[in-house]
Amino acid sequence: VAPSRGLGDVYKRQVEEAVDELMKGFAEEDEVIVLTDLTSGSVNQQFFRYRNRPHTHIVSGMNLPLAFQVAMEPQGEYITVERMREMVEEAKNEIKYVNDIADDGDDEDE
């Protein structure tokens, strides 16, 4: 077994144990929203097992606008699947390549 492969297995087990421990801490009626960076990442892969848990939303490729939207949702109400999809679409629209945005103001460097 190559050393890197062994370390990868150890890391995967650690992530799996951490995710399981975290999820065990929630009551069945608790809403759980998981925001991960990479769909193919190890953390997302471990949370994927909980995708059918009631009141659980798992979103990969998250960005700060999405995190803000989720945090600002009304407390005491479950977020619907439709609302989560809306928030994901809104967050996608916030990703911009700023160099392509037209400059309508004066540029002092010119």
Please describe what each predicted stretch is:
Residues 1-11:
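Single conserved hydrophobic/aromatic residue that forms the stacking wall/gate
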Residues 12-20:
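Structural motif
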Residues 29-31, 54:
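Short coil/turn segments at beta-strand junctions that form active-site/ligand-binding loops
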Residues 31-37:
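Acidic beta-strand-to-loop metal/phosphate-binding motif
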Residues 41-54:
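Short Gly/Thr/Asp-enriched flexible loops that form oxyanion-binding sites at enzyme active sites
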Residues 53-70:
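Short, acidic/small-residue loops that bind anionic groups at enzyme active sites
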Residues 73-101:
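Short, glycine-/small-residue-rich phosphate/pyrophosphate-handling segment
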Residues 104-110:
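Short acidic DE-rich linear segments
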